Amino acid sequence: MPEEDLVELKFRLYDGSDVGPFQYSPTATVSMLKERIVSEWPKDKKIVPKSASDIKLINAGKILENGKTVAQCKAPFDDLPKSVITMHVVVQLSPTKARPEKKIEKEEAPQRSFCSCTIM
């Protein structure tokens, strides 16, 4: 594939740092981009995605769908020669399963005493 057909992308993380730029074929899918981001993610960050499903990519204000190709996601103004397209990365970690809370039996519950005051 000729080099001029490749699309150069960089990915802006939540703290303003970048991953990339990398060159991709216009037929590469968003899912492939996410896998690359996860593998190249800086290990010193506080938030680290565990899988590609923890990441959302945004380009030109739109959340990109996994099945779309790079060519389908490019905005019309991205056709500038030799320009690097910046896509924003949002990390949404999968919710962890909450541990079931231990139910306190009525007999085990501590007794609470109440008092009331009456002002006459």
Swiss-Prot record:
Primary role: May serve as docking site to facilitate the association of other proteins to the plasma membrane.
Residue span(s) of the pro-peptide? 118-120
Residue ranges annotated for the Ubiquitin-like domain, each copy included: 7-73
Give the protein name, as stated in the record.
Answer: Membrane-anchored ubiquitin-fold protein 4
Taxonomic lineage of the native organism: Eukaryota, Viridiplantae, Streptophyta, Embryophyta, Tracheophyta
Per the record, lipidation of type S-farnesyl cysteine is found at: 117
Q: Which InterPro entries does this chain map to?
A: MUB, Ubiquitin-like_dom, Ubiquitin-like_domsf, UBL3-like, UBL3-like_ubiquitin_dom
List the gene name: MUB4
- Gene3D superfamilies, per this entry? Phosphatidylinositol 3-kinase Catalytic Subunit, Chain A, domain 1
- From the record, give the cysteines joined by S-S bonds: none
User: Where is the protein situated, by its record's location annotation?
Assistant: Cell membrane
State the GO CC annotations: plasma membrane
Expression is induced as follows: Induced by pathogens, cycloheximide and ozone treatment.
Q: Which SUPFAM superfamilies match?
A: Ubiquitin-like (SSF54236)
Q: How does it sit in the membrane?
A: Lipid-anchor
Q: What species does this protein belong to?
A: Arabidopsis thaliana
- Among the Pfam families in the record, one is Rad60-SLD_2
Q: Which UniProt keywords apply?
A: Cell membrane, Lipoprotein, Membrane, Methylation, Palmitate, Prenylation
Q: Where mainly located?
A: membrane
Quote the residue positions with lipidation, kind S-palmitoyl cysteine.
115
Tissue distribution: Ubiquitous.
